[in-house]
């Protein structure tokens, strides 16, 4: 059997891989309006997926959206003002770029640590350390 024939046969027998090539996906925000308040229903699952403290993510959201808010007893975020899911998702994406993904290798295997008052992002995959905007 020729090499090209074997290669063609192998390609035919190889199953298709479904899904994305990325292993890190942030859940889409589940948003609803209650009057002039935006409720972020799945905030806790987003934070756990990001591997970050609720308060840190909340502080970023408040600053980025220019509003006030709080985390209620059910773990939902209640933001003052009307924000659609697209705007919340864009803000979470900014958070991920700044505080979750490694600037060197792009992997989410990072931890936040303070050193001499500065907040650093330390990558457990490649060992890189980078400063954050905070």
UniProtKB/Swiss-Prot annotation:
<feature type="compositionally biased region" description="Basic and acidic residues">
    <location>
        <begin position="1"/>
        <end position="12"/>
    </location>
</feature>
<keyword id="KW-0648">Protein biosynthesis</keyword>
<dbReference type="GO" id="GO:0003743">
    <property type="term" value="F:translation initiation factor activity"/>
</dbReference>
<dbReference type="InterPro" id="IPR016189">
    <property type="entry name" value="Transl_init_fac_IF2/IF5_N"/>
</dbReference>
<feature type="region of interest" description="Disordered">
    <location>
        <begin position="1"/>
        <end position="28"/>
    </location>
</feature>
<comment type="function">
    <text>eIF-2 functions in the early steps of protein synthesis by forming a ternary complex with GTP and initiator tRNA.</text>
</comment>
<dbReference type="InterPro" id="IPR045196">
    <property type="entry name" value="IF2/IF5"/>
</dbReference>
<dbReference type="InterPro" id="IPR016190">
    <property type="entry name" value="Transl_init_fac_IF2/IF5_Zn-bd"/>
</dbReference>
<protein>
    <recommendedName>
        <fullName>Translation initiation factor 2 subunit beta</fullName>
    </recommendedName>
</protein>
<dbReference type="Pfam" id="PF01873">
    <property type="entry name" value="eIF-5_eIF-2B"/>
</dbReference>
<dbReference type="InterPro" id="IPR004458">
    <property type="entry name" value="TIF2_bsu_arc"/>
</dbReference>
<dbReference type="InterPro" id="IPR002735">
    <property type="entry name" value="Transl_init_fac_IF2/IF5_dom"/>
</dbReference>
<keyword id="KW-0396">Initiation factor</keyword>
<comment type="subunit">
    <text>Heterotrimer composed of an alpha, a beta and a gamma chain.</text>
</comment>
<comment type="similarity">
    <text>Belongs to the eIF-2-beta/eIF-5 family.</text>
</comment>
């Amino acid at each position: 059997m020729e090499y090209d024939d074997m290669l063609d046969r192998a390609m035919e027998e190889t199953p298709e891989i479904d899904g994305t090539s990325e292993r890190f996906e942030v859940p889409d925000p589940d948003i609803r309006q209650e009057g002039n308040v935006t409720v972020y229903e799945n905030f806790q699952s987003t934070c756990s997926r990001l591997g970050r403290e609720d308060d840190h993510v909340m502080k970023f959201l408040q600053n980025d959206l220019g509003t006030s808010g709080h985390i209620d007893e059910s773990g939902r975020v209640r933001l003052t003002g009307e924000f659609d899911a697209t705007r919340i998702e864009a803000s979470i994406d900014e958070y991920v770029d700044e505080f979750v993904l490694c600037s060197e290798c792009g992997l989410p295997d990072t931890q936040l640590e303070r050193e001499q008052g500065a907040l650093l992002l330390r990558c457990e995959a490649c060992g890189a350390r980078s400063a954050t905007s905070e």
